[in-house]
Amino acid sequence: MALRVYNTLTRQQEHFQPWEHGHVRLYGCGPTVYNYPHLGNLRAYVFQDTVRRTLHFLGYRVTYVMNITDVGHLESDADSGEDKLVRSAQAHGHSVLQVAAHYRAAFFRDTALLGIEEPSIVCNASDCIQDMIAFIEQLLARGHAYCAGGNVYFDVRSFPSYESFGSAAVEDVQEGEDAARARVAHDTHKRDARDFVLWFTRSKFVRHALTWDSPWGRGYPGWHIGCSAMSMKFLGPRCDIHIGGVDHIRVHHRNERAQCEAITGAPWVRYWLHHEFLLMQLQKRAVHADMGSSVVSSFSKMSKSCGQFLTLSSLQERGFQPADFRFFLLSGQYRTQLAFSWDALKTARAARRSFVRRVARVVDAARATTGSVRGTSAECAAERVCESRASESELLLTDFRAALEDDFSTPRALSALQKLVRDTSVPPSLCVSALQVADTVLGLGIIQEATASLSAQVPAGDTLPQRPLPSEEWIGQLVRARAHARQTRDFPRADEIRRQLKAEGIELEDTHLGTIWKRV
């Protein structure tokens, strides 16, 4: 069986075949760094990481590009609302680039804790402004863009297949798109309400924090042009896989595709993969006619703008490990909405600990028969398999591989490993070799944790991964941000910062001379 993926473009599962044999060009939508990543955001990056790891496992060479949006992302995908970075900078009393750098670092701290490997190339939008300007100039030259009211717009009518992408892919977001279109319909400079801005001049925001010189006046890029320009800069005119959330299909990704294919005149992305939302359990008290009341639970998409979200530090404060959350995510199919609750996470933690305990027993048995269990990195795992019965190990992973080749079915892949660990007919050393290879895909550190639990004589599943201590500069930035939040009476934000620092082992004490901190 070869890899099959569900392609949003065709709305069906297809055999995967990259443009270039053996080499996959992968682009993943990265974060807009105006706040801490919430758990729903992190689901996206665990999935991107899983796709990349799976492709490596299947023998592909992967060039993985991820953007960092630090300019031009408005509150609505359809050119309306405030700039998210500017609003965050104003709230914190810092420059846009300072805020972006802070939250960029926070993003990569969280992804590292989750075992997410860094992309081959990480590109900041603010570093690629000239590439965006050159891209817009090409669109204008080809008749796909026009200048009006000081801005440059993409002319949707010039690209006949614009509506064909995502037209029936996600009906649930239709209402949101229609609302966004309605908000910008009054823009009299647009020839069509669907047209979108490629370059804003000061006609949009008179005192925008970040502006650059351009042929159309000093201004800044729209959000959609950034991803197109960065993808084509680092991956070339063709991309094999583009990954993003279902909420971006109908506007952002549709616009990206239109921009790129208007330039090249040829298909741009071969396979579009879209992951579903992580839902958050909300509870509220309902008052009944008889004056009684009850607690009503519901699930809703995590949203920073609505204040409905949890961060990774929120989980750590409750005693969960990042690996518990990664295991929870891998237990769900990426194209299915996943409901997060504390009970669900407890169940995932129990399942992961049980699995690690079983693996620890297998590792112990392998030690007894071979004397040691060798390296645990992807390279050592591959070396070990090559040295000892590689074909047998590959055979043990037949079901695991088949699950991943079926549109990255991680729930089935986990089930296959559970079955392997319980199979007493498999020699322990061979089982460990197979598990080492499998974990280069799952990224759970199962063998490392099982081995550490045996060495440290602590319960398997309870060992914590090593992580670097936070720098004094980073701590100082957060302490100052918390002080500003308290001054502006943004107490929820101040509490969030305290919790984040506590999760990193930093204790705060507020005194009449200011806030002091110490490591605990």
From Swiss-Prot:
<dbReference type="GO" id="GO:0004817">
    <property type="term" value="F:cysteine-tRNA ligase activity"/>
</dbReference>
<dbReference type="InterPro" id="IPR015803">
    <property type="entry name" value="Cys-tRNA-ligase"/>
</dbReference>
<feature type="binding site">
    <location>
        <position position="304"/>
    </location>
    <ligand>
        <name>ATP</name>
    </ligand>
</feature>
<keyword id="KW-0436">Ligase</keyword>
<dbReference type="InterPro" id="IPR024909">
    <property type="entry name" value="Cys-tRNA/MSH_ligase"/>
</dbReference>
<dbReference type="InterPro" id="IPR032678">
    <property type="entry name" value="tRNA-synt_1_cat_dom"/>
</dbReference>
<dbReference type="GO" id="GO:0005524">
    <property type="term" value="F:ATP binding"/>
</dbReference>
<keyword id="KW-0648">Protein biosynthesis</keyword>
<dbReference type="InterPro" id="IPR009080">
    <property type="entry name" value="tRNAsynth_Ia_anticodon-bd"/>
</dbReference>
<dbReference type="Pfam" id="PF01406">
    <property type="entry name" value="tRNA-synt_1e"/>
</dbReference>
<feature type="binding site">
    <location>
        <position position="256"/>
    </location>
    <ligand>
        <name>Zn(2+)</name>
    </ligand>
</feature>
<dbReference type="GO" id="GO:0008270">
    <property type="term" value="F:zinc ion binding"/>
</dbReference>
<comment type="similarity">
    <text>Belongs to the class-I aminoacyl-tRNA synthetase family.</text>
</comment>
<keyword id="KW-0963">Cytoplasm</keyword>
<feature type="short sequence motif" description="'HIGH' region">
    <location>
        <begin position="31"/>
        <end position="41"/>
    </location>
</feature>
<feature type="binding site">
    <location>
        <position position="252"/>
    </location>
    <ligand>
        <name>Zn(2+)</name>
    </ligand>
</feature>
<feature type="short sequence motif" description="'KMSKS' region">
    <location>
        <begin position="301"/>
        <end position="305"/>
    </location>
</feature>
<dbReference type="GO" id="GO:0006423">
    <property type="term" value="P:cysteinyl-tRNA aminoacylation"/>
</dbReference>
<dbReference type="InterPro" id="IPR015273">
    <property type="entry name" value="Cys-tRNA-synt_Ia_DALR"/>
</dbReference>
<comment type="subunit">
    <text>Monomer.</text>
</comment>
<keyword id="KW-0030">Aminoacyl-tRNA synthetase</keyword>
<keyword id="KW-0067">ATP-binding</keyword>
<dbReference type="GO" id="GO:0005829">
    <property type="term" value="C:cytosol"/>
</dbReference>
<keyword id="KW-0547">Nucleotide-binding</keyword>
<keyword id="KW-0479">Metal-binding</keyword>
<dbReference type="InterPro" id="IPR014729">
    <property type="entry name" value="Rossmann-like_a/b/a_fold"/>
</dbReference>
<feature type="binding site">
    <location>
        <position position="227"/>
    </location>
    <ligand>
        <name>Zn(2+)</name>
    </ligand>
</feature>
<keyword id="KW-0862">Zinc</keyword>
<feature type="binding site">
    <location>
        <position position="29"/>
    </location>
    <ligand>
        <name>Zn(2+)</name>
    </ligand>
</feature>
<protein>
    <recommendedName>
        <fullName>Cysteine--tRNA ligase</fullName>
        <ecNumber>6.1.1.16</ecNumber>
    </recommendedName>
</protein>
